[in-house]
């Protein structure tokens, strides 16, 4: 097993910055040692939003953005390494998810695209990188997402308590950790994404701090019911989605027959949509004794309060209470997935993604001279 220090890098669907964590990882332990959040320049955020909403761009523009994101991720890693006085040889590898700009897991040619050139990260940090985590799972018939439930299982499963982990980023996803049962997980639908898109267009703010704007409005029930009829919400798991589906254009289509609504009422309705779709999926999945929240949505007290109200038989808490800072969860997960890759261990869960089999996932971009460490030797497939 490739035990040692790993760095995880995550730039999620909320586009609120780059999260970077440092952790010591071995077969039995994931010990977070440091973290930081690195700002995302507004022009890069805008370019990503444009792609995700289907605006055309040239291959040159895509290549430039891929380069810029790789440099941005490297800057974030170098800042953490400088803060912790680390040399490249002190770090086994960087696990970098990349920035998802398109995710289309169904149809005749399922595909997903994460950008942020891993070669730039290697060249600028001197540390080997593991990236491109999702496409192996898709090649095996899976959704390529979510991948974090495997990490939730390793850290947060309980021998007797029915638990769920809820990550509320741009998209919300659930991990079902039930004793004696295979782990399940799926995207419930929008997390912060639609609320962020609406307040950005209406007020020029990146997010609704503490849900205060939503709290000033009233839920428009006919609009909420129209939103809930979107076919994604009735699609059975395994399922996954992203900004290419739930975006500002989606809001505009829902509002087409609701002209003149107060903007704060739309925001209140979007918050209720997130809360109600999550709560419904918790209940349809059999319920949980404890729902542990991570991600940026966990800092929205209005949203958390609505979830608690909709789930009266469930203890709603934060992963912070379990010793894992919610804002760092996904970056920490990709540090762990990098460890799994270099150790030749599967990183996906077929019970979550629908893949035909568990597999080593991710591509390795080695540093030169490999950080004075050898790359993993993967076990031969059965029967070979």
Curated annotation (Swiss-Prot):
Catalyzes the specific phosphorylation of 1,6-anhydro-N-acetylmuramic acid (anhMurNAc) with the simultaneous cleavage of the 1,6-anhydro ring, generating MurNAc-6-P. Is required for the utilization of anhMurNAc either imported from the medium or derived from its own cell wall murein, and thus plays a role in cell wall recycling. PANTHER family: ANHYDRO-N-ACETYLMURAMIC ACID KINASE (PTHR30605:SF0). GO terms for molecular function: ATP binding; kinase activity; phosphotransferase activity, alcohol group as acceptor. ATP binds at residues 12-19. Transmembrane segments: none annotated. One of its GO terms (biological process) is 1,6-anhydro-N-acetyl-beta-muramic acid catabolic process. Its EC number is 2.7.1.170. InterPro entries: Anhydro_N_Ac-Mur_kinase, ATPase_NBD. Keywords: ATP-binding, Carbohydrate metabolism, Kinase, Nucleotide-binding, Transferase. Belongs to the anhydro-N-acetylmuramic acid kinase family. Pathway: Amino-sugar metabolism; 1,6-anhydro-N-acetylmuramate degradation; Cell wall biogenesis; peptidoglycan recycling. This is Anhydro-N-acetylmuramic acid kinase. The lineage of its organism: Bacteria, Pseudomonadati, Pseudomonadota, Gammaproteobacteria, Enterobacterales. The keyword rRNA processing does not apply. Gene3D superfamilies: 3.30.420.40. The keyword Nucleotide-binding applies. It comes from Cronobacter sakazakii (strain ATCC BAA-894). It catalyses: 1,6-anhydro-N-acetyl-beta-muramate + ATP + H2O = N-acetyl-D-muramate 6-phosphate + ADP + H(+).
């Amino acid at each position: 097993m490739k035990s040692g220090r790993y760095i995880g890098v995550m730039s999620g669907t909320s586009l609120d910055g780059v999260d970077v964590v440092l952790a010591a990882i071995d077969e039995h332990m994931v010990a977070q040692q440091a973290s930081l959040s690195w700002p995302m320049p507004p022009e890069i955020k805008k370019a990503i939003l444009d792609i995700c909403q289907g605006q055309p761009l040239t291959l040159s523009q895509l290549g430039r953005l891929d380069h810029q994101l790789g440099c941005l991720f490297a800057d974030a890693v170098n800042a953490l390494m400088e803060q912790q006085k680390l040399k490249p040889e002190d770090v086994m590898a960087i696990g970098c998810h990349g920035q998802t700009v398109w995710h289309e897991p169904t149809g005749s040619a399922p595909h997903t695209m994460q950008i942020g050139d891993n070669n730039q990260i290697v060249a600028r940090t001197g540390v080997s990188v593991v990236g491109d985590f999702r496409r192996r799972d898709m090649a095996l018939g899976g959704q390529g997402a979510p991948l974090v439930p495997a990490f939730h299982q390793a850290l947060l499963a309980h021998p007797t308590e029915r638990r769920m982990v809820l990550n509320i980023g741009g998209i919300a996803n659930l991990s079902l950790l039930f004793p004696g049962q295979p782990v399940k997980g799926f995207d419930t639908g929008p997390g912060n994404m639609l609320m962020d898109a609406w307040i950005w267009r209406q007020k020029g703010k990146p997010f609704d701090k503490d849900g205060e704007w939503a709290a000033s409005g009233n839920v428009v029930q006919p609009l909420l019911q129209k939103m809930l009829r979107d076919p994604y919400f009735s699609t059975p798991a395994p399922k996954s989605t992203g900004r290419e589906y739930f975006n500002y254009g989606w809001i505009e289509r829902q509002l087409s027959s609701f002209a003149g609504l107060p903007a704060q009422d739309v925001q209140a309705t979007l918050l209720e949509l997130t809360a109600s779709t999550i709560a419904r999926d918790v209940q349809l999945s059999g319920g949980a004794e404890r729902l542990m929240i991570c991600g940026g949505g966990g800092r929205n007290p209005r949203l958390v309060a609505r979830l608690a109200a909709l789930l009266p038989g469930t203890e709603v808490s934060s992963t912070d209470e379990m010793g894992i800072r919610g804002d760092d969860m996904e970056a920490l997960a990709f540090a762990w997935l990098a460890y799994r890759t270099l150790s030749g261990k599967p990183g996906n869960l077929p019970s979550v993604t629908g893949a035909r089999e568990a597999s080593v996932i991710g591509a390795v971009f080695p540093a030169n001279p490999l950080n004075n460490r050898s790359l993993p030797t993967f076990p031969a497939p059965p029967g070979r």
